[in-house]
Amino acid sequence: MIGECISAGELAEAVLIVAHPDDEILWFASIAEDVGKIVICFLDDPETPDLADARKRTLKEHPLADRIQCLGLTETCSFGHADWSDPEPASSGLRIAATGEVANVYEERAAALRTELAPYIADATHVFTHNPWGEYGHEEHVMVHRVVSDLAASGSTRVWYSNYASSWSTGLMLRYCGR
């Protein structure tokens, strides 16, 4: 709803759910230190094996480490695998144009996220997460938004997100305008 605000007390009880370590700062720097809990979904990236250890060290030293919980799921390697010229929303987030393993892993991770995120959303009144078009067009951001929104719809949890978009994600963003 346009014009609604969230109080400082409500923000302190809110949950921030992001796909990757650093998304909490890149997309939510203005509220990250004010929310009660930060949930990071993915940790390992099969395309960059050393990244998980570096991310673990960084999360341990993060200034907000006391409120960060990392689910530790492995990334899907789906970035750039949706058809962004004609993006097709799906129950997992987006239809992945690539066939085979990437599409299967994307579906599997969405199912895992539904299970892992359900308790966080069931206990929350307000959740901040990625927008429906994945900011600049990141398939895993779209997935996280879809899972969070679907879980929130079954209760009274309010979902908040930014309006950032890029030329890559504008087509999908325009599908949500006027809702």
Model-derived regions, located:
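Active-site rim/loop-helix segments in enzyme catalytic domains that contact anionic ligands
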Residues: M1-D123, A153-S154
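Short catalytic/ligand-binding loop motif for oxyanion handling, primarily in non-cytosolic enzymes
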Residues: E47-T48, T76-G80, E135-H138, H145, ...
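Charged helix-capping and loop-helix junction motifs
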Residues: R55, H141-S149
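Acidic/His-rich, metal-assisted hydrolase cores and their charged scaffolds
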Residues: H141, L151-R158
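His/Asp/Glu-enriched short active-site or ligand-binding loop at hydrolase and phosphoryl-transfer sites
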Residues: R158-S166
